[in-house]
Amino acid sequence: MSQKNFFDEGKSYGVNDYAGFHFENGADSSLPQVSAQGVVRETDSSNFDASPVASGSGISDVGPFGADFHQLQQHVQTPYGGMTMPASSSSGATSVPPEQDPSLSVSFNRLPKSASTKTKNGRIRSSRREDDNRIPFYDLDVAEGAEDDLQEDFHVEGMKTKSGRKIQRPVAYNPNATALKRKSRKVDMVTLCSVCQRGHSPLSNRIVFCDGCNSPYHQLCHHPPIDDATVQDVDAEWFCMKCQYRRAKQPLETGMTAQDLGLSESDKKMYLSSLPTPHLADLILFCEKSYPSLPIYNPRTRELLGEIRHQLLVSSERQQISLQERLHAKQDEAPSDEPAPVPYTASYVANSGTLYDYPTLIRLAIRNTLSPSKDEIFNWLAQNVPLLPTFHDSASEAIRWMVNKGQLVRSGSIYQIATVEEYPHLQPSLLPTFQRNRKVPKLVPVSFPTDDPQNLCATVL
């Protein structure tokens, strides 16, 4: 097989043109084998002798290559620019290690990446071994330290999916976190007296709250009236009569003197003011029985008793008025005992002013006409129900819907209600509520409807 020329015959090449080629030492290969775009094919280094090429290339810096020429490199300036090429150890060039991160300790594989052999027809066959693409061995301690440094410098704001979309991890729920309080508008409470149900509180008639049940009372509405000194003294406790009677049911324990207990005047006053009024009255009466000569009554006691009785009458009248107002309000809300007019009758629909749906009106028309055809139904509706003059289309649609739903049965031009139940107390009306709650029996026609009423009969299941 003749050798194939890859270059034009008229073009000459210089010795420095070896930069773009890869030379081979074969006897039958006088020209280098070049691949596309100046990429040199990899050849077997065991069959390659670079000494004649280097000696005849005119480059004085490069000496003859030794057996370890693939381990040494040097930088050479050529007309095509600077390049790095193998150099012999005898030329004085130093070994250039591969570029690497100084923080990483790397041990590279120094074996050739591939080996190629020639076939009988002159073609080059490349054979690769499993250890050609060998991964460099890193020092694990140094590598882990470098990864930690990279993680510290790299801050991820959000994760990315395979499609490149950013996602963010949801925030974990913290049950101990304080919830944000919603801003709410403060509403002033309207205080109403428990007796008169009024909220005004003038200076002469203040509203006072009970310290027992927290019920509000006007000074003059409560019985007995509340003293002004109690209102002015903020620290003083006041209980309404209901709370006082409730507390008075508990027995009062006595039997000790103030000297035995070592009580001061303030302690005595504080204890006696905390007692309910009935208990205080019992104590005073007990003291009066023991010492009848004690001057504890007011000279104007008779007049004061008259005023107290008058206030009792006024307060009782106020209570009666408030009770009557509440009773009347409840009676107005309660339904009356008079029977309400029966709805869905002709007179009720005509006079009540309430307009019902078309199915209800059609039932009324059928009940109140002798031969309820469509024209008779429309005439009855026009005379007894306040409808618009153009109600015929809507009424016709309602009749058709009732026939399809089985609520009406058509016998020729006559329509009848599909029910056999009668309500004597509601004649001639039919309540739709009863119709909805009751199951309407299904109608199975024996024959198809015709104009002849006798040709249509229905069987009630």
From Swiss-Prot:
Subcellular localization: Nucleus
Q: Which InterPro entries match?
A: Zinc_finger_PHD-type_CS, Znf_FYVE_PHD, Znf_PHD, Znf_PHD-finger, Znf_RING/FYVE/PHD
Which Gene Ontology BP annotations are present? chromatin remodeling; heterochromatin boundary formation; negative regulation of gene expression, epigenetic
Q: Which GO terms describe its molecular function?
A: chromatin binding; DNA binding; zinc ion binding
User: Per the record, what is one GO cellular component?
Assistant: Lsd1/2 complex
Name the species this protein comes from: Schizosaccharomyces pombe (strain 972 / ATCC 24843) (Fission yeast)
- Name this protein carries in UniProt: SWM histone demethylase complex subunit phf1
What is the gene name? phf1
Q: Which top-level group of life is the source organism from? A: Eukaryota
Q: How does it assemble?
A: Component of the SWM histone demethylase complex composed of at least lsd1, lsd2, phf1 and phf2.
Which keywords describe this protein according to UniProt?
A: Chromatin regulator, Metal-binding, Nucleus, Transcription, Transcription regulation, Zinc, Zinc-finger
Q: Where are the zinc fingers (PHD-type)?
A: 190-246
Ranges for region Disordered: 79-130
Query: Which portions of the chain have biased composition (kind: Polar residues)?
Result: 102-119
Keyword Protein biosynthesis in record: no
Q: What role does this protein play?
A: Component of the SWM histone demethylase complex that specifically demethylates H3K9me2, a specific tag for epigenetic transcriptional activation, thereby acting as a corepressor. Has a role in regulating heterochromatin propagation and euchromatic transcription.
State where it is primarily located. Answer: nucleus
